[in-house]
Amino acid sequence: QASVSIDAKFKAHGKKYLGTIGDQYTLTKNTKNPAIIKADFGQLTPENSMKWDATEPNRGQFTFSGSDYLVNFAQSNGKLIRGHTLVWHSQLPGWVSSITDKNTLISVLKNHITTVMTRYKGKIYAWDVLNEIFNEDGSLRNSVFYNVIGEDYVRIAFETARSVDPNAKLYINDYNLDSAGYSKVNGMVSHVKKWLAAGIPIDGIGSQTHLGAGAGSAVAGALNALASAGTKEIAITELDIAGASSTDYVNVVNACLNQAKCVGITVWGVADPDSWRSSSSPLLFDGNYNPKAAYNAIANAL
């Protein structure tokens, strides 16, 4: 692991966590990955084990072995957990996406949220209740949930989640929320303002922050725009940056540091070989699980 924990240094500035992702495969494939997580990160998001295809592959038949492993590892090592994700159009079993009856889909939606959240009630800091529900132009994506239920699925999902675990922070999460003035950012802000005014219990906006090289400089403005929607908090939820330049990473960390509502940052992976975009070397540890220049730059900046 690194000589200094960026999580500890980030928390010293009043933030809640600087975390990463994990699941049984990456936590057991070698000893270096879990050692780095224990030493240098303060929060874990399950990479895949809490997605719908993993937790309810068949209607009413829930499988929690993968998510249990992640939650148990996180709890036994004192890490906060972000639950990810309850409702998403992707990694969605065919039995869900083929539902055409509104009342059936509402029932399925409520049951899925209730069952998954109940299992981990009191153990999860925040849930990504809805993931990637916007188009790039800021309109709502034509998912099965939107097409069959209508926009009201947003209210149903958040109200169900709130009733199950009142202490968990409830988030709406999306990507390409990385530049102020971009249509998707504007759409997120205007919709969340409207939903909050209608009493829908949204606590936070999650910005995935999957960036190209050089894009770190725009994140501060983007976070300020997202904060204007009126949620209690915001977070950077899936950070990785092509090329992993120190400048980009420090810009992103400072953006969260300087936005009072930004509670934490989750980096989407520990070391480059395990990244979903490994060819662009976007993470803070290299193929030998050694900290890269960007890691040390963050530590120095903090």
Curated annotation (Swiss-Prot):
Pathway: Glycan degradation; xylan degradation. Its main location: secreted. GO terms for cellular component: extracellular region. Residues 21-301 form the GH10 domain. It catalyses: Endohydrolysis of (1->4)-beta-D-xylosidic linkages in xylans. Disulfide bonds join C256-C262. The modification Pyrrolidone carboxylic acid is found at Q1. Its EC number is 3.2.1.8. PROSITE patterns: GH10_1, GH10_2. One of its GO terms (molecular function) is endo-1,4-beta-xylanase activity. The active site is at E132, E238. The keyword Metal-binding does not apply. It is an enzyme of class 3 (hydrolase). Gene3D superfamilies: Glycosidases (3.20.20.80). One of its GO terms (biological process) is xylan catabolic process. Belongs to the glycosyl hydrolase 10 (cellulase F) family. This is Endo-1,4-beta-xylanase.
